[in-house]
Each structure stands twice: as structure tokens, then as C-alpha cells.
Amino acid sequence: MLKYGVIIIGGGHAGVEAAAASARLGVHTLLITLKPENLGEMSCNPAIGGIAKGTLVKEIDALDGLMGFVIDKAGIHYKMLNETRGPAVWGPRAQADRKLYKKVMYQILTNYRNLDILYGKVEDIQIKSSKVEAVILNNGIKIFCQKVVLTTGTFLSGFIHIGSMKIPAGRIYEEPSYGLSNTLKRLGFKIARLKTGTPPRIDGRTIDYSKTTLQQGDQIPRPFSELTDAIDVPQINCFITKTTAETHDIIRENLDKSAMYSGQIKGIGPRYCPSIEDKIVKFSTKLEHRIFLEPEGLEDYTIYPNGISTSLPKEIQYKLIKTIPGLENAQVLRPGYAIEYDYVDPREINITLETKKITGLYFAGQINGTTGYEEAAGQGIIAGINAALSVKDQEPFILTRATSYIGVMIDDLTTSGTVEPYRMFTSRSEYRLSLRADNADLRLTELGINIGVVTEKRKNIFTKKCNNIEKTKLLLNKLSLTTSKLAKIGIQVAQDGKYKTVLDLFKIPTFNVEQAIKIFPILRKQNNNILQLLYIEAKYASYLTRQYADINLFQSEEIQLIPKNIDYFKIPSISLEIQEKLSYHKPTTIGVARRISGITPAAIMAIIIYLKTKYSDGSSK
């Protein structure tokens, strides 16, 4: 009889991270996917990272995940977004060679210890006494297991829409999954529909780049992974063009033919990644919209025109493409399309990503209502970790809003749910100055080491980095000049006759690392990433101190548990509406209860008093 500790269904960005994490924890793991060669497939844009998303990638890497390492082996255009603004909103991003990314991912996973990969399609999940028992393939084979992580992406009852055409598919040229949709409905999960889309692909050899604007990447690419010393993949340029009045006229004249506006699509699309039809309708006074022409590979002439996702008929797509500067003679290789799919209300899962209804069943990725590779991967690694820890009868691994963007995302989803595709933004985090891309490993890697999900290689690299940080900090506190000497070289400080260390100088708004190196050449020998980290920590020290105080308050509420069997209707001082809301959401801690919409401070205090009265020893087990 075939039996595994953890089975992952789906080999997208959530699935590969879940599978690898489970395997790293020493659990016998099986990844079931329709096409093994499509592991980590970039279904839409050929890029990883961005504002907030880049921080998610760094956090995944901090837990020894795959995404950051793989993009460093396949990244062809690196750019730090928002670098002219504060470090809390910097967004590392890299264009990928789409085929190379898949190739590297396949090579890694097919050689992963404790991980088997099976080509197949799961039709059903066998449940016994509200507990996972096995998965059933479409050929009738039953594979027994203790835990299942469902990472179905856009495949649950998926339909592609191109104009009036409606094609059953989970991705173009790939069949959807109806069996698992039926399974979830049978088990009583709350199912709804969401929509996303992708633009047409263009033959780069037919583009007139002289009519576009060159967009260069960073001169020195900054790796995502702490395992990467430097990027050795050749780097290439992207280009920018824009829509025209003629483009907009064509779209307006044919809105009734768009699947989005004809009523054919019922699912809600992503607010922050709208189709070109949505842009023209919702921003009707805007005369043009930027389009980023992004190469899909070093040896691939396919161009991804980021900014014109559409579900218009093919012939209309071809027509509007011709109105865009540089694309007048462009050949369309594949039309754009919208895709509609099932998802589950994420309030049906716990913060471990295990479902509330079925023990041993975990959800990760678009099934939880998110959009984006990075959001999916962040959920995948947590689901994989917790499924494996549960197999080993160990405590679950919880990331909170105070420790990570992954924690913010999971808390948002499980507390508030979502009725539209959820995308991560820096604005979603109240602690974003503390949760930066540059300190992800310092926040999370030790936590990963403690539970055993971090390999020895990364552990050694992390330990060495921590030692180097301390040595560099000592050096920066040692290197100093008097205020009079600083004034002579143009550094304006209060003339109090005291020595100013480099860390003191970092607090001056106009002072930076480059100036420090110029004044103290010995700093050239130091790791620049560590210098930048200490520069940020020093410059924003007063803000960070206040934020850490807020975090301590937050964490005190996060550890104040609410018992699973609490009866809110026995707390007379809160309204029936709030009692019903709390009974539905079943918050696990006081902190989670406070974040539920409509829960008043008075209600929170009533719960705290009730818990103290009910549980005289102060516990809430």
C-alpha cells in the first residue's frame, strides 16, 4: 500500500515550496502534478518580486525556500523598485528567463531528498471521521497519507475567456480540475469565483524598438538569495511604450465583446492588476497607459507586454496592438485571455493553513483567494512546514504580523477573508519599517533553524553573516572624527567638540554609506550589504524603537489564547451581533479577535475579563 506523510497536489509556486519544505523536515513527501516539466511554471508575467512581493521572496529564502535561489539562477533583468524612497518600501524585482526558471526548479526538485514526484491527476480526497486518509487519482489508484496540501492555482473548474469563447482550462492548453472542486463542495467548503488575466504575447523580432523607451536594469544586480554570492546570468534590457487615443477608441467600441463586460465572467478580478478594458473604463480621463515590454528569455524572442491584460476577441487584440508605438507591425504569438476559477473563503482555514473542517487538509496559494507567484509561494512554504510538523507531532510554525509579510498576508486572509484576488502591499503592514527585504533572514532564519527546516549550508552562511554584522558594528562604533574635522570636510554637525562615530554620522539625513567609505577607506573591505543594513538601522533608530514597543504590545495579545470551546453567548456584556461574529470567525487569540471587523474595544475587554473569571489560573487551554 502506497503511503506518504504529506502529499502536495499541484506543482505551481505554492506546491513546490510546500513540497520542498516538507521534505527538508525529513517527512516522506509526494508532489503530484499534471506535468512535472512545468514545476514552478510562470503562468503570467516572467518576473519575480516587486514592491512588498520582493520582501515575500526574501522571507521565503530566509526559511530555505526555493524561489529566491531559482530566480538568481534565471534572472535576466534586476531592478530595485522605489529605491528613491524609504527602505521600508524598497522592492527587489527580477525578470526571469521563463524556460530557464522552470529548468532550474525541475533540476532541484527531482534531486530533493525525501521527495517523490508523480505525474498524475487527483480526482478526489478520501476523508474518514473528518480527517484526511488518502488521495484518489483519475485512474482509480488510491495513495494513503497523513496530510494533504492543496495548491490548485487557477485549475479548480477553470475557464479561459477570449471574447465570447469559453474554454475549459486551468492554464492555456492544460485541462482544469472538476473533481477537486466537487470534493470541496461535498465537504461543505464555501466556494466562490475569482478572475485573473494575461496579455497577448508578441514576437520581439517584429517590434520597432526605436519608438520605445529603453529601461535598463541595475548596474550591479542584487541577489534575492543569501546562498547567491553574485548574479552570473547575462543581463538584458526592457522597453517601455504606451497606449494611444486610437487604442482607447478601439477598446471602447468593443467593450461589449470583452468577456469582462459582456457578463460572461462572474468572478471578480484583481483590483491592482486590472485589464486594459478596466483601465479605459475606470480611468476614462487618462490619455495613455504605460506598457512594459519584457523579454521572456535570453534565447526566446517572445515579449510579454505588461499592462494590456485582456479578454477581448483575438481579432480586436490584433487590431489594438497595431495602434501602440513600436508595435505597428508586431506579430501576436498568442492572444491574451481571462481565466475564471474556484477559490475557498480563506476564513475556512487556520493560521497554520490547515482547514477548520478537515484535519490534515491544508490550502495554499490561489485557492485561498490570493494572486501572484510570491503570495502563493509564501503560503506554500508555511503549509508545507506545518503539514510536516503535524506528521512529526510537533507544535505548528506560526508567523505573525509582527515578524513577517507572510504573517501579515495569512492574518489578513484568515481574519478578514477576501472577495477579490488578494495582493501583498507594504501598506498592509503596520510594522513595515521593521519588516524590510534586507533583514528578512535576521528575522526568520533562526526560527527556521529551530524547527529544522533550514539546511546546514544556510545555517553556516547565516551564522557567518551574524558574526560579520557584529564585527562591522564594532568597527563603525570605533571609527570616528571630531566635529571640527568633520566640518572641514563639509559634514555639518553640532560643534560640541565630541567625537562622532560612523553610526552617529549615519543618523544625519544627508549622510550615506558612500560618504562613510570615502572618509574611512577601510570600509571598502566590508560587506556592502551589511553596511547598508547597519546604515538603515542607525538612520531610523528612533522610529524603530517606537515600532518595537508597538510590536511588544501586539505580541502580548497574540499569545493570549482563546479556548476553542469558548461559548461567546455566555458573555452577557457583548451584543448578539458580536457574539455571532466571534462564533463564526473562531479567533484563536485576543489579537486576532481585535482585528475582526466590527469587534469593539469594549467587547475585547469583556472577553479578557471573562477568560480571567472562567480560567482562574489565567490559562485558556
Swiss-Prot record:
Indicate where this protein resides in the cell.
Cytoplasm
Q: Name one Pfam family in it.
A: GIDA
Keyword Cytoplasm on this protein?
Answer: yes
Asked whether the keyword Mitochondrion is assigned, the reply is no
Which residues hold NAD(+)? 269-283
Q: Name one GO biological process term.
A: tRNA methylation
Record-listed FAD binding positions: 10-15, 122, 177, 366
- Going by the entry's taxonomy, the superkingdom of the source organism is recorded as Bacteria
- What cellular component GO annotations does this protein have? cytoplasm
The UniProt entry, under SMART domains, shows: GIDA_assoc_3 (SM01228)
InterPro entries to which the protein is assigned, alphabetical:
FAD/NAD-bd_sf, GIDA_C_N, MnmG, MnmG-rel, MnmG-rel_CS, MnmG_C, MnmG_C_subdom, MnmG_C_subdom_sf
**Required co-factor?**
FAD
Q: What is its main location?
A: cytoplasm
Q: What keywords tag this UniProt record?
A: Cytoplasm, FAD, Flavoprotein, NAD, tRNA processing
Picking any one GO molecular function of the record gives: flavin adenine dinucleotide binding
Q: How does it assemble?
A: Homodimer. Heterotetramer of two MnmE and two MnmG subunits.
NCBIfam families, sorted: mnmG_gidA
What is the protein's known function?
NAD-binding protein involved in the addition of a carboxymethylaminomethyl (cmnm) group at the wobble position (U34) of certain tRNAs, forming tRNA-cmnm(5)s(2)U34.
Could you tell me which HAMAP family the record lists for this protein? MnmG_GidA
Family to which the UniProt record says this protein belongs: Belongs to the MnmG family.
Q: What is this protein called?
A: tRNA uridine 5-carboxymethylaminomethyl modification enzyme MnmG
Q: What is the lineage of its organism?
A: Bacteria, Pseudomonadati, Pseudomonadota, Alphaproteobacteria, Rickettsiales
